[in-house]
A protein has these predicted regions:
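TPR/TPR-like (Sel1-like) alpha-helical repeat modules
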Residues: 674, 680, 684-715
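Structural signature of tandem alpha-helical TPR/SEL1-like repeats
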Residues: 556-569, 576-579, 589-606, 610-613, ...
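Intrinsic disorder/low-complexity segments
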Residues: 748, 752-789
């Protein structure tokens, strides 16, 4: 919306070069940024909108235009098929300086372009074609820059940076665009706000030394003599993040380096931590489901509901692997546990449109003869093709109404989510690999783990640059395969012309795979007839956080016994640290072990009576046992330190409701909606509270909002056929699961002068997912929709 209902001329969003006269460094940074390439100068976005308009018409594409295409939208051109206007100046403008700097206020944290714009009349002088008028404008600004600063750098932009960014970095879809219902898309704001990183989340596993906002990471200070400099520095308008695709397609080496440096700056860590005998029958646990209708993960912004799984008792482990001398026997099968931890990241990893990336954990084992004995997360075609389907992915896997994967950024057709796996800020994921030790293995195995990232996914890039419909029959037998707003049964071929694509060179780019973090350990190999290696641990005080991270990953997947065992190690190495006791209590609460939870949480309170997370979980314990007064007391201790923690507010409101203090509960729950108007739990409890107060109108209003945001539970039935066709994805869907190696070369040991003279015979290509002799491109061009990536 625009203040006063004014019309803003589209050229206002196309004249960033007028800013260059005084802000050259900032302009040059922006010129390479993803903001500049947000529109139809970005082939990935361009193709998604062309496909959208071909499928459901031009009108729904306006849903995206408010944040991606202001010049096109305000010129009234989004009713025209983009294919007809893609090379016009409006379509190539992207998000210019004026788009962000003319925002006068953010209306809410609901995102989806929920801001007010203000059109500064003096813009016409700044962008005048008359050089004398421009010179006069610039002279007046230099004479007194304060009015210019007040117009384009408003206080809320610094004071409420995250809310400012949320207006476009939090997204939902609804009936006008998907002909279905409200559903959450990506969401960088809520999980940041609810985490310890923001300084507003009380329940995080870790609190940072200092709260961080979006710009602290994504607009770091850089040296500059630009007129907007602060002590010789400006905030980078490269907006460094994770988009390696655009600078690759644009052949922009400086932007690509800035992005790669950002990705590898230590925001995440990988730790090959533990080794244990493989479980005979792994209990996978229940599939995690969210109450909110969402295609994205839900973090600390909602109360965790973890379904217990796995074995009744924890299996002893050998850990940490770099502290002991781990050994395996030839012929045995072992489990290797790798911990991925988010450290300096303020939102889920990965973030953004997580249905469209390749993000996965690779584990490779190579013996001292150079033989690869294990490989999960291999990339086909010598590292240029798709990632093998059995890898451990971090993404959202969605399907349309016919169970076809959402792999063309066709989010409007999403009807069900197969799984979402992202790592919350300040948390961890514990990944399990099942490794068979071959009989003919060397005397030492080196395990290498890499957290790999490729923007975009292989299939999405092929589609964006060369995708076109293959008119062969659909898997349902229809010719041509039907396309509707609810599903697309067509197959895709990557044979379209590259002429006129939005890239520097007319070719499909070979996108880099970035190793965001990695780790390496060595295992000794024992003869098959040697005694079985016994579990061994070495406890060092400096490793308390590694044990804690290991436990966090196990807790979040519902392996509660193993998580408890890990947290107990924390208390052994540092009994004065309350975190180990708190996390044992947190685990006991999930398990329903009230007595144990009370014991350990009271121990934690004795160590630090004011620690917010301890008070929250102790308050939750009191609530579970019906001691509502004590529960409220501990929740209020938390809120005195973290007044904007939504889950604590929701719990206090719930306690007041249970005590029939309806008016007090309403007051507390309204504070939740001030943080997020879409909070599902707040609407549910407000519905009940207003019903208790006899206010039928308000009760029905919150009931309607609750039902609007609540998940469509019946939609999960759609995933069944897809999961049957794609067992690797069904495995990944389970809260607790293991990954095995791709088929590897068969190695035969010949009798020779050296003990390990090696000859290698390769397994046929059919074992890697395609018929022998068929090219990978041909195989993927004729893949059925249910198997496309």
């Amino acid at each position: 919306q625009v203040y006063g209902g004014e019309k803003i001329p589209s050229k206002f969003f196309m004249e960033s070069d007028s800013c260059k006269r005084c802000h050259e460094d900032i302009y040059n940074q922006w010129n390479s940024s993803a903001h500049h390439f947000s529109s139809f100068n970005n082939q990935w976005y361009r193709k998604s909108i062309e496909y959208m308009q071909d499928t459901i018409g031009t009108k729904p594409s306006k849903w995206c235009g408010g944040c991606h295409d202001p010049a096109v939208l305000y010129a009234g051109k989004m009713d025209t098929p983009i294919k007809q206007i893609v090379h016009t100046p409006e379509a190539q403008a992207g998000l210019g300086c004026m788009m962000c700097h003319s925002i006068a206020d953010v209306k809410s944290t609901m995102g989806q372009g929920d801001f007010y714009l203000e059109y500064p009349k003096l813009h016409e002088f700044a962008a005048s074609k008359n050089p004398l008028v421009r010179a006069l404008h610039d002279f007046m600004i230099k004479l007194n820059p304060e009015p210019h600063r007040r117009v384009f750098l408003k206080p809320f932009m610094k004071q409420q940076t995250a809310e400012f960014c949320s207006s476009c970095h939090k997204v939902h879809l609804d009936v006008p665009v998907n002909n279905y219902r409200w559903i959450r898309g990506f969401n960088e704001y809520d999980n940041w706000q609810a985490s310890g990183v923001s300084g507003e989340g009380a329940r995080s596993f870790y609190y940072p030394a200092k709260p961080q906002q979006c710009a602290d990471c994504h607009m770091p200070l850089e040296p500059s003599n630009d007129m907007g400099n602060i002590a010789g520095k400006v905030h980078s308008h490269r907006f460094p993040a994770a988009n390696t695709a655009l600078p690759t397609a644009n052949e922009d080496a400086a932007q690509l380096k800035a992005t790669e440096d950002f990705l590898t700056s230590g925001a995440l860590t990988v730790d090959i931590f533990a080794l244990s005998p493989a479980r005979a029958n792994l209990k996978t646990g229940a599939v995690a489901q969210h109450e909110l209708a969402t295609t994205f993960a839900v973090g600390e912004e909602a109360e965790a509901k973890i379904t217990p799984g796995a074995a009744a008792e924890a299996v002893p482990v050998t850990a940490p692997l770099n502290r002991v001398q781990p050994a395996v026997r030839r012929g045995d099968t072992v489990r290797v546990d790798v911990v991925v931890r988010t450290k300096r990241i303020g939102h889920f990893f990965p973030g953004g449109t997580v249905d469209a990336y390749d993000t996965w954990l690779e584990l490779k084992g190579v013996d001292d003869n150079g033989q690869t004995i294990f490989w999960s997360g291999m990339v086909e075609d010598n590292g240029k093709g798709p990632v093998e389907k059995g890898a451990h992915f971090y993404r959202s896997l969605q399907v349309d109404a016919h169970g076809n994967p959402i792999n063309k950024r066709n989010a409007w057709a999403t009807r069900a989510v197969v799984y979402v796996r992202l790592i919350p800020p300040g948390a961890a994921d514990t990944v399990h690999f099942r490794m068979k030790i071959p009989e003919k293995t060397g005397s030492r195995i080196t395990l290498t783990a890499r957290l790999c990232y490729r923007k975009f996914a292989w299939f999405n890039t092929q589609f964006a640059f060369a995708g076109e419909r293959d008119n062969s029959p659909s898997r349902h037998g229809a010719v041509p395969a039907p396309v509707t707003p609810d599903y697309d049964d067509t197959k895709m071929a990557f044979t379209a012309s590259l002429h006129g694509i939005s890239a520097k060179v007319e070719k499909i780019p070979d996108l880099p795979i970035i190793a965001v973090a990695g780790n390496e350990v060595a295992l000794d190999v024992l003869p098959a007839n040697a005694p079985a290696p016994q579990p061994q641990t070495q406890l060092a005080k400096e490793d308390w956080q590694r044990w804690n991270d290991y436990g966090i990953g196990l807790l979040l997947q519902g392996d509660l016994k193993a998580a408890q065992a890990a947290f107990e190690k924390v208390t052994e190495v540092d009994p004065q640290n309350p975190d180990g006791w708190v996390n044992i209590g947190r685990t006991a609460l999930q398990e329903g072990d009230v007595a144990r939870a009370r014991t350990v949480l009271e121990k934690a309170l004795a160590l630090n009576p004011k620690l917010a997370r301890t008070n929250f979980f102790y308050g939750s314990l009191m609530k579970a046992t019906g001691d509502y007064d004590q529960a409220a007391t501990h929740f209020q201790i938390v809120l005195a330190q973290y007044p904007r923690d939504r889950v604590v507010l929701n719990n206090l409101g719930r306690v007041l409701f249970l005590e029939r203090k309806y008016a007090g509960a309403v007051k507390v729950l309204q504070q939740v909606l001030a943080v997020d108007p879409e909070d599902l739990q707040a609407h549910y409890n407000l519905m009940l509270c207003y019903n208790g107060l006899g206010d039928e109108k308000m009760s029905k209003e919150h009931q309607a909002r609750y039902l609007r945001f609540k998940a469509d539970e019946a939609s999960q039935a759609i995933t069944g056929p897809y999961r049957q066709l794609n067992p690797e994805d069904n495995n990944e869907r389970q809260s607790i699961h293991e990954h095995v190696s791709v088929p590897l070369p068969i190695t035969t040991i010949h009798a020779a002068t050296t003990p390990y003279a090696v000859t290698t015979t390769h397994v046929g290509t059919a074992a890697l997912g395609r018929p022998a002799g068929q090219s990978p491109t041909a195989a993927r061009a004729t893949t059925t929709p249910g198997a496309q990536r």
